[in-house]
């Protein structure tokens, strides 16, 4: 019995994880945002930063793929969640209607 309690005391408690700020850094310096043609610099991915989010949305309103944006898998997941959160908040439209198309 005494041996079990000694083992429990030596086990470290779980540390709370700090929330990491997602940063958009081009992988290997080759990421190019397809809409602008400019290399992507260092940005903090946030749903309130609509100027950045719009660059990763197609003219039809779809989220661009990793191949088109050059993001890593982790950055793409964070970007998709930020775009979805901005859509629900009304900051970014769900669908972009082009001038010649009908509803």
Swiss-Prot record:
One term of GO molecular function: small ribosomal subunit rRNA binding
Cellular localization per UniProt: Plastid, Chloroplast
Protein's UniProt keywords contain Cell wall biogenesis/degradation: no
Highest taxon of source: Eukaryota
Keyword Plastid: yes
GO biological process: translation
InterPro entries the UniProt entry points to: Ribosomal_bS18, Ribosomal_bS18_CS, Ribosomal_bS18_sf
Alphabetized Pfam families for the sequence: Ribosomal_S18
One annotated Gene Ontology cellular component of this protein: mitochondrial small ribosomal subunit
UniProtKB keywords: Chloroplast, Plastid, Ribonucleoprotein, Ribosomal protein, RNA-binding, rRNA-binding
Assembly and interaction partners: Part of the 30S ribosomal subunit.
Protein family per UniProt: Belongs to the bacterial ribosomal protein bS18 family.
Stated name of the protein: Small ribosomal subunit protein bS18c
Source organism per UniProt: Chlorella vulgaris (Green alga)
Biological classification of the source: Eukaryota, Viridiplantae, Chlorophyta, core chlorophytes, Trebouxiophyceae
Gene: rps18
